[in-house]
Amino acid sequence: MALSGNCSRYYPREQGSAVPNSFPEVVELNVGGQVYFTRHSTLISIPHSLLWKMFSPKRDTANDLAKDSKGRFFIDRDGFLFRYILDYLRDRQVVLPDHFPEKGRLKREAEYFQLPDLVKLLTPDEIKQSPDEFCHSDFEDASQGSDTRICPPSSLLPADRKWGFITVGYRGSCTLGREGQADAKFRRVPRILVCGRISLAKEVFGETLNESRDPDRAPERYTSRFYLKFKHLERAFDMLSECGFHMVACNSSVTASFINQYTDDKIWSSYTEYVFYREPSRWSPSHCDCCCKNGKGDKEGESGTSCNDLSTSSCDSQSEASSPQETVICGPVTRQTNIQTLDRPIKKGPVQLIQQSEMRRKSDLLRTLTSGSRESNMSSKKKAVKEKLSIEEELEKCIQDFLKIKIPDRFPERKHPWQSELLRKYHL
């Protein structure tokens, strides 16, 4: 009787001291629903890995492994990423496609299969995020990483890629009843859409950007399929403002529909878009250099760069960056103002320029407040004069307003009971 190629002979333990290999030469694997065929020597090519422990010929573990209905060895992991694990087991190298979005998950799979060399190959980008090579602010350390955005330095960005437009849109709805009702439901925003250049969108929104609809696009390409993971519109505005963007245009369309024919409640739905723009001067290379480099701080502090934009930068002026090619994390910074007298000279620098700009801003605000109070006093006086109208003028105005009212000959659509009552009352 001939045996098939997948069958193996049974050796009783009493006849020999060594246990023969119970695995076939070609092993069939079912990894998360994906079927793989590979050699047994490939699975045990790296000692002390998880696959080496599972398929090692030193111990008879073939009967202990889980199998599917067709007898294939089942591994409950990501079937799509397992192909890169097999590639690494074959020749100790792994080649990923361009703009591969699953790099973090592949690293987690390598850690599960106990492949330390593969983990090292997948961690160069994350090693750059160490505290020694970054310039962190106090806000980022306390925010648990939810609002952290990784902004590339200006030296790595092309000159024509530091500016651009970003469009933020959302479709909102709200339910409003009659005037004076307190149980009206306010704005609901199911999703905030982001359109623009991919590199700009990632720079502003970072990890809060959902890229599942366009995962493999190059950073210099444009997209209109991104959306944010949160639903607070004002939070998106704050993130855009911190990165130097300002709104240049907006539009909105509103439609209303009745809930039913017996009530006056309406559901208002709207689609609104806000267009933000960042000029090249608002994100010049001197912004991060003034905050991160001590050598160029004095020269660039005396230049014509706007100091108000420096307050939105994330790097503290007293921290140092190790190299100009490193990445910088952006976020708000709280700075303490130093009290200095007028009789001693002050060396100009970025911190002093920021203080001067804050003083100018406060003085401008004081002028606007005083001018606004004067205008309000003048307007109140004019209103008082208008209120002192005579009774005859008020009656004449009421008569003119009454003459302007035009009652239609007939009402074609009677949607509400009060319309029919009005017609009966005036015999129309």
From Swiss-Prot:
GO terms for biological process: behavioral fear response; memory; protein homooligomerization; regulation of G protein-coupled receptor signaling pathway. The keyword Nucleotidyltransferase does not apply. It holds the Pfam family BTB_2. The modification Phosphoserine is found at S130, S137, S143, S146. The modification Phosphotyrosine is found at Y112. It is found in: Presynaptic cell membrane; Postsynaptic cell membrane. InterPro entries: BTB/POZ_dom, H1_KCTD16, SKP1/BTB/POZ_sf, T1-type_BTB. It comes from the Eukaryota. Signal peptide: none annotated. One of its GO terms (molecular function) is identical protein binding. Homopentamer; forms an open pentamer. In contrast to other BTB domain-containing proteins, does not interact with CUL3. Interacts as a tetramer with GABRB1 and GABRB2. Auxiliary subunit of GABA-B receptors that determine the pharmacology and kinetics of the receptor response. Increases agonist potency and markedly alter the G-protein signaling of the receptors by accelerating onset and promoting desensitization. This is BTB/POZ domain-containing protein KCTD16. The lineage of its organism: Eukaryota, Metazoa, Chordata, Craniata, Vertebrata. The gene is KCTD16.
